[in-house]
Every structure is written in C-alpha cells, then in structure tokens.
A protein has these predicted regions:
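Non-catalytic terminal/accessory segments
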Residues: 1-163
Length: 163
C-alpha cells in the first residue's frame, strides 16, 4: 500500500493510520466527524450493515458551542436573541450530520439544548433549577423557536434515470 501511495507522492501518517476489522461490528473508526461501524440487523440475525453517526469529538464540539451560546453571562439578554444566535449553529451542524444514522444523537443534542435554555431562563428569572422541568417543557422550547434536530435525518435514495 505504501509503495502505491509513494508513486503518487502521498505518505500515510503513522499516528492516524490503523487497520480496523469491521466484521462482527466489534470496532469502528472515525472519519470526517462520523463514527463508522458495522451494526447487526435487528430483523435478520447474522446480517450486518455499515452505519455512521456523529463521533464523540463531534458531539463534544456541538456541546461546547451550545454551552458558549447559553452561558450564564448571557442571562441579561432576551431568550429570543439567544435562540437567534443558536439556531444557525444547530442548523449547520444538523445539515452536515443528517445523512446517516444520527437520530439518537440528534435527540441527545435536542435535550441538551433544552436543558441549557432552561438553566439560562432559571438564572435569568432567579428560579430554583429543580423546578425547571415543570415550567420549561418542550412546548416552551418550541414557542421560543428553537431549531429541533429530531426528525431531520435523511437517508440516501437510489438514483433513477427516468424519474
């Protein structure tokens, strides 16, 4: 492999290059922000399919961005302006990761956004954080206009020449 790449003037990075056995679904690899792994079918035992979802690094990155946009220092701002700043971040991240098997990760990100906005509202209105689940439900988040990632996953469709 190194000889073929050498003729093309390419070199493999020894720290980043590793051989992964995908059979059996025991391990996977991260590439371009996605974690790729063979996953066994729930309907057909013994049949594996390659699936991809956002990697741990990608999840940590979006959590850090959400945390920055909902910091305690922003409690003096109106929530609609916080949401206006947060929505483009969520839209862009969701547009990149919506192709694949990202549904479960999208639910995690949505619940994290909900939690952070509730904490920010509780700090803003000087309420106890234990009471946030009663007052700040998902309907409240929807009324704020927060972009929801849940339900935005798109699956690849086969191309048809005559359609």
């Amino acid at each position: 492999m190194a000889a073929i790449l050498g003729r093309l003037g390419l070199v493999l990075h020894p720290d980043k290059t590793r051989i992964v056995c995908l059979t059996g679904g025991s391990e996977g690899f991260d590439f371009l922000g996605f974690h790729h792994r063979m996953v066994e079918s729930s309907k057909h035992r013994g049949r594996f399919y390659l699936q991809k979802w956002p990697s741990q690094r990608a999840m940590a990155s979006i959590r850090a961005k959400i945390r920055d946009h909902t910091a305690r220092q922003l409690a003096s701002r109106e929530l609609k302006y916080v949401v206006q700043d947060l929505n483009p971040v969520l839209r862009g991240w969701g547009a990149y990761f919506r192709h694949g098997n990202s549904g479960r990760k999208f639910v995690i990100v949505d619940s994290y956004v909900h939690e952070r906005l509730c904490r920010l509202a509780a700090v803003k209105h000087k309420e106890r954080l234990r009471q946030w689940s009663k007052r700040f439900d998902y309907a409240w988040v929807t009324r704020l206009g927060v972009y929801r990632l849940t339900g935005t996953v798109r699956y690849w469709k086969p191309a048809h020449a005559l359609r």
